[in-house]
Design a protein with these regions (language model features):
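Histidine- and aromatic-rich segments of cupredoxin/plastocyanin-like copper-binding domains
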Residues: 37-38, 45-276
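Hydrophobic or amphipathic alpha-helical targeting/insertion segments
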Residues: 1-18
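Core domains of carbohydrate- and sulfate-ester-processing enzymes
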Residues: 16-21, 37-39
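Beta-strand segments within the central parallel beta-sheet cores of soluble alpha/beta enzyme folds
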Residues: 7, 43-45
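Gly/Pro-rich turn-and-neighbor structural signature
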Residues: 21-27, 31-35
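OB-fold nucleic-acid-binding modules
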Residues: 80-82, 278-284, 337
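Extracellular/periplasmic ectodomains of large secreted or surface enzymes and adhesion receptors
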Residues: 262-304
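C-terminal substrate/ligand-recognition segments
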Residues: 287-340
Length: 340
């Protein structure tokens, strides 16, 4: 749906940032049309692809270990470049791959060595992180706009920097909506920014356990190369889909950016109380009575399994610790009931 639909809703997400009625969140979009403006609301379908020796798209439908391409496309464009104006944008990033996971970062290129991370040896450039806010996911808008700026320990591991300008791992068909302001954080007209993939795959069965570091990828300490193998050219020393995959070039903006400031909707963090809510949750995690309801609710566990052999049940689902069954449309393992 993200690739073909407008994804606009009648109240909160109007697609017109100028409407100030106390309901519309005024997300970056534009204001020329009554609703559904897309000037500053951009869909990005990110996917890996492969081509054969004749330049034709190639795919192996019999590969049950997960298909991996060796090139990354955005909206079916190779090495895309997007001119952006010096203002806020909303990017709806969808993982359109068959088997590949992504871990996407945003950086700005800086002439010389004044950036946080050095570029490749002899390149004459360095890079700095570009903070942004995560405002939505597969379930559409979230309760708060989460800052990816190093101000919060987002995964509770004690390290605030591992999500500074770096999104969480993004699974197949998973969507992240972010707001980037191209007029803040030292960004100037003419600057070049890049989306960077930090997630390595060695097989299609799943990504490597830990994502790669921005320092290693931007310096090209980690960089796949082509070598001649027994069957012809092949990739060596890494995953070719790791690295920069989309460039944005900042253009001047003479208009007035009237879209919302996501910082006003941030969750509570050290030294700052919680801001406004975009979508109030049905259950309040700070309400003891609501948490009692959650504990009293019935919890189910589904475990999806796969065998490495060629037995009669290569794909199975276990329900609540039971047996692993293969697909049978006549069997009901979990029948949800209202208010349970």
């Amino acid at each position: 749906g993200n690739a073909v639909m407008m994804n606009y809703y009648s109240a909160l997400d109007r697609g017109n940032e100028a409407i100030e009625d106390g309901v519309n969140l005024r997300l970056p979009s534009g204001s020329a049309l009554p609703w559904g403006n897309r000037d500053y609301d951009v869909n990005l379908v990110v996917a890996d692809k492969a081509w054969d020796a004749n330049g034709q798209l190639w795919f192996n439908p019999f590969n049950t270990d997960g298909f991996l391409g060796d090139q990354i496309l955005v909206n079916w464009q190779y090495e895309p470049r997007l001119k952006v104006r010096a203002r806020s944008y909303r990017f709806r990033i969808l993982n359109g791959s068959v088997s590949r996971y992504f871990r996407i970062a945003l950086v700005r290129e800086i002439a010389g060595n004044g950036g946080e991370f050095p570029g490749p040896s002899g390149s004459g450039v360095s890079y700095s992180r570009v903070p942004f806010h995560l405002i939505g996911n597969d379930g559409n808008l979230m309760e708060h706009a989460v800052p990816f700026d190093g101000s919060m320990d987002l995964d509770g591991d004690g390290d605030k920097q591992n999500h500074n300008a770096i999104l969480p791992t993004q699974g197949i068909a998973e969507r992240f909506d972010i707001i980037v302001n191209f007029a803040k954080n030292g960004i100037k007209t003419g600057d070049k920014l890049y989306f960077v993939n930090l997630m390595e795959h060695k097989t299609g069965k799943g990504p490597e356990k830990n994502g790669l570091s921005l320092a290693d990828v931007l310096s090209e300490k980690y960089k796949a190369v082509i070598k001649q193998g027994s069957k012809g050219p092949e990739w060596d020393k890494g995953d070719p889909v790791v690295g920069k995959f989309m460039q944005m070039i900042v253009q001047p903006y003479t208009g007035q950016d009237v879209s919302m400031n996501p910082a006003d909707y941030e969750p509570a963090k050290p030294g700052k109380a919680a801001g406004k809510k975009m979508i109030p949750l049905t259950l309040d995690r700070d309400n003891a009575a609501d948490m009692v309801k959650v504990k009293a609710a019935r919890h189910r566990e589904f475990i999806f399994g796969r065998s490495d052999g060629t037995d009669e049940a290569p794909w199975t689902i276990k329900t609540d610790g039971g047996f692993g069954y293969d697909m049978d449309s006549r069997r009901i393992s979990a029948a949800a009931q209202l208010s349970t």
